[in-house]
Regions:
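Cleavable N-terminal export/targeting peptides
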Residues: 1-60, 400-401
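Gram-negative and organellar
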Residues: 46-401
Length: 401
């Protein structure tokens, strides 16, 4: 399949513009401690015109959230290999920072940055992995029902990717990709509990080896409805048009066609649901179901269809946070086949993922964290199958103002 460029997979239903770990602080809300003086002042001043005005402290111009995480663990398949697995202990560090400007009149601004580095202590082929992600977003509200946002995202990835896109050469490789994506989002709050959003973006990916350099255009439409009793649902359609700088088309038999240019179009349809319940809503559950149809501009050699489901559960008892994410995906290729003979089987690929994360707050700023991640890919072509297990244990420091 094509190596897919960076695409934000939004699982949250209301906003989902930042990673899952930062969904809660994405919106600037007036705390209860600041709301109480307002109520008290209005009560005391009713009928007392001569009473002195209550001084209400102004909100700070900027809100800041920062965290640093350090973990140690073990990964049993660094190269995503079906044989000859390379295993290693690992050390990983992650830093995050979120800046939000207090809305002034109709404008608001936020920026989020995340950096992550992994060192494999016994790695031979792969010694290090790293990634960096930066997003800035400027918002403008011309009216109470309209919001225009312009996010700009830059990213860098240096890691092992699965490049199993042909049956001629199925492999994994260490790739370095630098990219950026930018484009406007226009949201219409047509009801107090529903909104409609249209978005467009342009994306550029540059690889260290130049193998998959190209441009991608995005266009999408999303609908979200907040129901009663903590229920929320949504649906969306997203289209992506990708043009490679140097990749060429393939014939139906898997041969390169010199002098051609490869392009593709992906249409993705999704349905999402979420629910919060309990006192102070410690329980959260989400579910996303999607279908993707990919077509190339040549013989259809890279045509494929994907079905994916993503359940997610979160529980926040006092001092704890437990998060479970799972995903299952099936990929069916239209022309690519496996085996030899007069009637070879169409190529099929199944992928499964599960991730468990546990956090225990030890103090206002410190937390202990542990996690386990499992990934499995199965295909009727054995060389494209692999399994990965990763366990982590460490600490997290966070600060906000």
């Amino acid at each position: 399949m094509f190596f897919r460029p960076f695409v934000s997979r939004e699982h949250g239903l209301s906003e989902g513009r930042l990673p899952r770990s930062l969904r809660d602080p994405i919106a600037l809300r007036l705390p209860l401690g600041a709301a109480f003086p307002l109520l008290l002042a209005s009560t005391l001043c009713a009928g007392r015109a001569s009473s002195p005005a209550v001084s209400i402290p102004a909100l700070p111009a900027w809100s800041t959230f920062a965290s640093v995480e350090s973990v140690f663990g073990y990964k049993d398949n660094l190269l995503l290999s079906s044989a000859g697995e390379e295993r290693s202990a690992l050390a990983r560090g992650t830093a995050e920072i979120l800046l939000m400007r207090t809305p002034t009149q109709a404008f608001e601004y936020s920026a989020f940055a995340q950096a992550e580095g992994t060192r494999f202590l016994q790695g031979e082929t792969v010694r290090n992995e790293s990634r960096f992600w930066l997003r800035q977003e400027l918002g403008w509200r011309p009216g109470p029902q309209w919001e225009l946002q312009f996010p700009v995202t830059g990213y860098f990835d240096d890691k092992v990717f699965d490049q199993s896109d042909t049956e001629v050469e199925r492999l994994t490789a260490v790739l370095r990709v630098l990219g950026a994506i930018a484009g406007p989002n226009l949201r219409w709050d047509f009801h107090r509990s529903a909104w409609l959003e249209v978005n467009a973006a342009a994306q550029r990916d540059v690889y260290a080896d130049g193998s998959n350099d190209g441009w991608t255009r995005h266009g999408g439409l999303r609908l979200n409805v907040s129901l009663s009793r903590g229920w929320e649902t949504g649906a969306g359609v997203n289209s992506r048009w990708r043009a490679f700088d140097s990749r060429e088309q393939y014939s139906a038999s898997g041969r390169i066609l010199p002098g051609t240019s490869l392009r593709s179009r992906e249409d993705e349809y999704e349905v999402r649901m979420a629910r919060k319940w309990g006192t102070a809503e410690p329980w959260k559950a989400g579910f996303r179901c999607s279908f993707l149809d990919c077509r190339d501009n040549g013989s259809g050699y890279f045509d494929r269809r994907e079905w994916q489901v993503e359940p997610e559960f979160e529980w926040k008892p006092a001092g704890w946070r437990l998060l479970l994410r799972t995903a299952a995906r099936r990929v069916e290729f239209g022309i690519q086949t496996v085996g030899v003979g007069l009637n070879p089987s169409p190529r099929i690929r199944d992928e499964y993922e599960a991730e468990l994360r546990v956090e225990r707050r030890c103090s206002e700023k410190w937390s202990m964290i542990g996690g386990f991640r499992w990934e499995r890919a199965r295909s009727n072509e054995r060389v494209a199958s692999y399994e990965v297990n990763e366990g982590l244990l460490g600490a997290r420091w966070s600060w906000e103002r």
